[in-house]
Amino acid sequence: MCASVFFIIIYMFYIHYSHKSVLLNEAIQSLNIKATGMYIDGTFGSGGHSKLILSQLNKRGRLLAIDKDLLAVKIGKHIAEQDDRFTIIHSSFSKMINHVKNIGLIGSVDGILLDLGISTFQINDCSRGFSFMQDGLLDMRMDISSGISAAEWLSKASQENITWVLKNFGEERFAKNIAKILVSKRRYTPIIRSIVLSKLICDAIPHRNMNKHPATKSFLAIRMFINNELEEIMQVLKDALIILSPRGRLVVISFNSLEDRLVKYFIREHSCALSIPPKLPLTNNQIFSKYKNKCQLKNIGKLTPSKQEIKRNIRARSAILRCAEKLAI
């Protein structure tokens, strides 16, 4: 057995027992899966959602998975070798529409799933720099084959730019204090390790929330900025309206307020709920003819984890699942 295959098998064993997909069953139920359907898992990760989707498809069903993380793609390719219903692509979900066009399935996809959270194996891999609790190189890129690392950005960004990122992406009230300390520190020593960044942030915050690590918001902000996460989410949401078939489902799991706000307002903007009072004596066709620019989605609703799931997996506490269905008009 070659070393790479052995590594993947060991790693799959590790993630099977360490990574818990949040709202796993709820997400798959929300997709309302048809056995012969075509589905897209836009964030393959450790493959938990993809495996459950595949278990509900028959021989004619298909699943396309996408991930920016090269290790996730390696794991996915191992599954693809054993199941010809499954394909995985190394890409960002913001480019999903290009891949769907390439296979001629625009307007024919029955469901899109996006799990916007960072995976356990990414957090636990010290070399990635995502964790403020472990020491490692400060990278933070989802795709290590492109873009600049967090360390590179911190070495060049102005104090004003760092402040803006921490405030707007992390909603960090002490953004100015943190930016000032980071710029002062880098004059003498490059900030290239996650534990160093974490300590500097802690030193900059005068009042601490005992229930949350002081570096939580700043690490989130830098990660989201480095990976262009909000713009990519906005792009895939817009494209989903074109990709989905009539009655196709869009299911998104968010883990912070900025992501959830984007998803919530997108669904509201493209559904009829904002502009049409309930119980009007009108058919769907009549409503659509009057409000066709807005009425493209039906808001199915939102779900949050149970107390039992949060107890089993603390990562679940901030998760919100939102689901919408493309109108069949």
UniProtKB/Swiss-Prot annotation:
Disulfide bridge partners, by residue number: none
Pfam family for this entry, one: Methyltransf_5
Record field: transmembrane: none
Binding residue positions for S-adenosyl-L-methionine: 47-49, 67, 93, 115, 122
Protein's cellular compartments: Cytoplasm
EC number of the protein: 2.1.1.199
GO MF assignments: rRNA (cytosine-N4-)-methyltransferase activity
InterPro entries given in the database record: RsmH, SAM-dep_MeTrfase_MraW_recog, SAM-dependent_MTases_sf
Function of the molecule: Specifically methylates the N4 position of cytidine in position 1402 (C1402) of 16S rRNA.
Family: Belongs to the methyltransferase superfamily. RsmH family.
Name of the protein in its database record: Ribosomal RNA small subunit methyltransferase H
